[in-house]
Amino acid sequence: MGERLAGKKAVITGGASGLGVAIARMFVEQGAQVALTDINLAGAQKIADELNASRQGCASAHAHDVADEEQWIDALAKANTEMNGINILVNNAGIGTMGSIEQESYANWKKVMAVDADSVFLGCKYAMQYMKQNQPGSIINMSSIAGLYAAASMPAYNAAKAAVWLLSKSVALHCATSGYQIRSNSIHPVFIRTPILDGITDALGVKTTEERDKVLTRGIPMRRIGEPEDVAYAAVYLASDESKFITGIELKIDGGMSAQ
């Protein structure tokens, strides 16, 4: 086990699947204690049990709809009690929809904005009180390459992830100018091999994951889909004291796509 995050106490939303699981596993491997929150409590508890089997008492699970303000207040209070402090927040939970501006419904627009953008505002706002008591701290907000580059087929997702990008900078400036030792940064992955890609397979009209990957990697110079660990390594760096002079940045994990 490493020690890059020894003594750190992290809240990770969307901790039952995908990137949340990869980040939680790597945080624990590096010595952190984690509180996994998810609307799927059973899934989050399963991951917490797995982590506790490797190091007893390193993980807990909490039911949490990230679009609900009161649930944010409750989940953070419980996590703070469970871990005796919070100094890392990973706003990872998110959803996506496909469809042009003419196809997208207002209901879907509001849902994506609530889960992907409002949740980050709520997390940053309500975690701050705990993080100020446990400095230094790090806020890591999961945006997307789609928050920097638009596509005709995902207006709601583009808008929500772009909001996360600039909100992260606003929070970084607030903390820095307030004298808080709390950093705020955003991560911007391209296509990562998680369950969210399943919906893209159908939208592309292809039948196999191999066909899907071939289509999706056409614009990626490294010609591959990202792995969850690619994002988790970045999260460990931003959570650790190794990045103590880094705040307000967008870290792109895109296989060179944005370099073109």
Write out the residue ranges for each language-model feature.
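Short C-terminal tail/terminal secondary-structure segment
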Residues: 2-4, 149, 236, 247-260
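Canonical Rossmann dinucleotide-binding motif of NAD(H)/NADP(H)-dependent dehydrogenases/reductases
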Residues: 3-35
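Substrate-binding pocket helix/loop in short-chain dehydrogenase/reductase
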Residues: 100-101, 105-110, 139, 212, ...
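Active-site helix of classical SDR
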Residues: 124, 160, 168
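Alpha-helical segment proximal to the catalytic Tyr-Lys
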Residues: 129, 173-177, 244
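Residue(s) in the substrate-gating loop at a strand-loop-helix junction
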Residues: 144
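Short, small/polar-rich loop/turn modules that mediate ligand/substrate recognition or access, typified
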Residues: 176, 181-183, 246-248
